[in-house]
Amino acid sequence: SFISDVTLSTSAFGAQYDNPLSGVLQFKQREGNKESFNTNIRVSATDAAFTFEGPLFKNENKESNTSFLLSVRRSYLQSLFKLIGLPIRPDYWDYQYKVSHKIDDYNNLYIIGLGSVDEFSVETPDEYNESAQATLEQAPFIEQKTNTIGVTWRKRFKDSSGFMETTISNNRLENVFTNYQDPVNEAGIIFRNDAVESETKLRYQLTNFVGDWKIASGFNLQNSFYSNNTINNTDAIFYTTEIDFIKYGIFANATRSFYNDKLDVSVGFRMDDDTFTTSNDLLATFSPRVSLSYEFAKDWRISGTAGRYYKIAPYTILGFRDTNGFLTNQDSDYTRSDHYVLGLQHYLSPSASISLEGFYKRYSDYPV
């Protein structure tokens, strides 16, 4: 109920996106109702969801400058599994919200958040048999929490020459995975993995309309934190690591249409670096890309793209330490992916189309 548009890009990603190699899935959220309150309740076989939206600070105005969307979902799988006699108890909550505020005719503020709480546990079944015993011994205990919050300020220039967007956000993942000798009483740890990932980001994008060109440029700045604590009592392995570093990048992109909008051209680049790895710099991750799209007949388009993309290694690799406690992968290169794509698209209606796409993607410096 939040989503107004979804776009999947399997190549020719916008230069503003850092770290994708194979695809970008972009969600566009709608705004809440600015005139009245609406409620929606959905019930399925596994969960129930509640959505609420409406205006804030409306007063006597017909339309408020501020609106909100709030959705909460709760599972009742644990009750269902108990009813049918299974010892496992999956349990989850998730939520998302959006607040939109119109400051004036040229400035808007958006606050977006989403998160989840997942827990997986076991209980002694009413009928204890070999199958139930095997399930109890093998079932892990999982506790996972995710949270993302972002604030975006969008400013349109009064001379209609463009706009700018500034976004500050944080996303955090906490994951605890445990196996017990006595799962029912949660006693006697066999294995436990406790991991945390947190990213705090600042992104600025300036979009200008220069003649028939649309030019976007900007930068991103990110603080990355990762920690992992592992206990393996079976093999007497005890492992801990923690890293904290800055990642940054710059980008630019220019688009224009020619021949009465029959030919669309897009060219761009981005460069990325960080304070953790030692074998990379901005020039080493220079990633150009170009895209062409031509309408050769009514409702028919052929397109071609070529581009290079980079992605930093996963935190589990960057944070790995040897038996002496030294970080061994600071010399990791960014993974590189070169894309060559040719596609054909037919528009069935203003809101529907069908496309056929062929691509060649070559990866290098892939961590194994």
Give the positions of each predicted feature.
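N-terminal periplasmic accessory domains that precede
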Residues: 1, 8-11, 16-39, 50, ...
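Outer-membrane beta-barrel channels and translocator barrels
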Residues: 3, 34, 46, 57-63, ...
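Transmembrane beta-strands of outer-membrane beta-barrel pores
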Residues: 10-12, 29-31, 43-47, 56, ...
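Residues that define the transmembrane beta-barrel architecture of outer-membrane proteins
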Residues: 19-21, 44-48, 91-93, 143-147, ...
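Membrane-embedded beta-strand positions of outer-membrane beta-barrel proteins
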Residues: 39-43, 68-72, 111-113, 164-168, ...
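Transmembrane beta-barrel wall of Gram-negative outer-membrane proteins
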Residues: 44-76, 85-119, 141-164
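Face-selective signature of the C-terminal outer-membrane beta-barrel domain
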Residues: 100-118, 140-280, 295, 355-356
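Surface-exposed extracellular loop regions of Gram-negative outer-membrane beta-barrel proteins
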Residues: 125-132, 174, 227-230, 280, ...
